[in-house]
Amino acid sequence: MELVGWLVDKGITSEKQWIQEDQASYISFNAASNSRSQIKAALDNAGKIMSLTKTAPDYLVGQQPVEDISSNRIYKILELNGYDPQYAASVFLGWATKKFGKRNTIWLFGPATTGKTNIAEAIAHTVPFYGCVNWTNENFPFNDCVDKMVIWWEEGKMTAKVVESAKAILGGSKVRVDQKCKSSAQIDPTPVIVTSNTNMCAVIDGNSTTFEHQQPLQDRMFKFELTRRLDHDFGKVTKQEVKDFFRWAKDHVVEVEHEFYVKKGGAKKRPAPSDADISEPKRVRESVAQPSTSDAEASINYADRLARGHSL
């Protein structure tokens, strides 16, 4: 029982994860005569408990407060693209905790090498159970999305055949989906993260593209536009960075606007200039205006000069 509790706390669902987390304990259990059955039973029980009693935030939010978040790769990607990391982090946290109602999806949009897959992959791998949408199989695209903590839709497209089920899943509604070689199964409200460089709000119907579902789809998403390419040595986002980012978000929550486009901003304000930087105001150059002569005075002077000429 103690072993199962430890596996649940660590989010371990396979022998590989167990070895990576604590090799010594795995070897000690594997040395017993009936070790194989014990290990399998412990992992099965832990998996059932996690799927029934745990949610994504239980594994995404770290336990320890984070003092310096500036070196976190998720923080860097968001800041590089002009987003306020604190506001964006609050969007991610609210998304994971299903706080925003039917706006249940984060869409990371942008070209290759901008970090969208880097972020989504790290978040998906941090939770014990995540499902991937297989959009190439229109008959069973959501076959892998049942009983998951996070659903990841990678580089997909929206087709007329799946759009209604997709709207329900993206909006966090319960929906039954067909499964291959099985009866239909229910997908419970699950946070969805989408990564693509195509318009996920345009529905492809054969050779035509329609936009009749654009507004309903936008009402179910937060869209981040990642356009800045990362350096070749930027590196992969780690599980610990994911946990640190969500923990920092929890400790610095701000109010989030329910809008399709996540607002940008948060640029650092320029400091006020010091006294040394303030130069003395330039002195205004004073000019002495010459006295002007009115028209009446000019005519009198002309008449006077004319009279003097005649007298001479």
Curated annotation (Swiss-Prot):
Protein name: Protein Rep40
Gene Ontology annotations for the cellular component aspect, listed alphabetically: host cell nucleus
Region annotation (Disordered) ranges: 264-301
UniProt keywords, alphabetically: ATP-binding, DNA replication, Host nucleus, Hydrolase, Nucleotide-binding
Enzyme nomenclature, EC number: 3.6.4.12
Reaction catalysis annotation: ATP + H2O = ADP + phosphate + H(+)
Cited Pfam families: Parvo_NS1
MF-aspect GO terms: ATP binding; ATP hydrolysis activity
Function: Plays a critical role during packaging of viral DNA into empty capsids, where they are thought to be part of the packaging motor complex. The single stranded genomic DNA is packaged in a 3' to 5' direction and requires the association of viral DNA with Rep40.
Enzymatic class: hydrolase
Assembly mode: Homooligomer.
Keyword Cytoplasm tagged: no
Encoding gene per record: Rep40
